[in-house]
Amino acid sequence: MATTIEVKTPAGTTDGSVELPAELFDVEANIALMHQVVTAQLAAKRQGTHSTKTRGEVSGGGKKPYRQKGTGRARQGSTRAPQFTGGGTVHGPQPRDYSQRTPKKMIAAALRGALSDRARNGRIHAVTELVEGQTPSTKSAKAFLSTLTERKQVLVVIGRADETSERSVRNLPGVHIISPDQLNTYDVLKADDVVFSVEALNAYINAQTARTEKEGASA
């Protein structure tokens, strides 16, 4: 069953309501799936450029440090062996790709579960805009967001062309801004509340509906 939420305005009034489709905002959250998707997402962000030198890559050490026999010490062939200070590293990290392959349907299902969890707890909000007019105002945007939620971490989803809203909240601590096509499980779960502009909410719903219809037609 679709959930209806009110659309708030910066002036403190209500400008109608919007429906959150049940297939996107009221599905059972699969915790294991969300964990898998978030783990893959964070792994893909890793640069993987870490690198250590083996004994063959460390400069120097070509000369045998002392003769093979007669010193009473253990035989050594190079001062760049791992047991020496300044020597190579054994089994150290090497450059690698940490990204994992995650099917698109799993990514979409995890996002639906995360949004549904926030919606069931009343943490999805819809607004007409973050500030009135075309002049950015961090002070006004902060005051408006404080009327929506008192929690610290807020995910703001706005259209790419909404520069006024973006410039108004980009410096606010605890506020993360993304466009509807960038919406992902990690950002939703990290945020306490998700604030959609009506434009962004409709764009997300329409995109997901179109994708579902396309998948149904190709099945």
UniProtKB/Swiss-Prot annotation:
Which chain regions cross the lipid bilayer?
none
InterPro entries from the UniProt entry: Ribosomal_uL4, Ribosomal_uL4-like, Ribosomal_uL4_dom_sf
Annotated GO MF terms: rRNA binding; structural constituent of ribosome
Recite the UniProt keywords alphabetically. Answer: Ribonucleoprotein, Ribosomal protein, RNA-binding, rRNA-binding
Q: Kindly list the GO CC terms recorded for this protein.
A: ribonucleoprotein complex; ribosome
Q: Record keywords: Protein biosynthesis included? A: no
| Region listing for Disordered, in residue ranges | 43-100
Q: Describe the function of this protein.
A: One of the primary rRNA binding proteins, this protein initially binds near the 5'-end of the 23S rRNA. It is important during the early stages of 50S assembly. It makes multiple contacts with different domains of the 23S rRNA in the assembled 50S subunit and ribosome.
Q: Please report which protein family the annotation says this sequence is part of.
A: Belongs to the universal ribosomal protein uL4 family.
Describe the subunit structure.
Part of the 50S ribosomal subunit.
Record protein name field: Large ribosomal subunit protein uL4
Q: Which organism is it from?
A: Mycobacterium sp. (strain KMS)
The uppermost taxa in this organism's lineage are:
Bacteria, Bacillati, Actinomycetota, Actinomycetes, Mycobacteriales
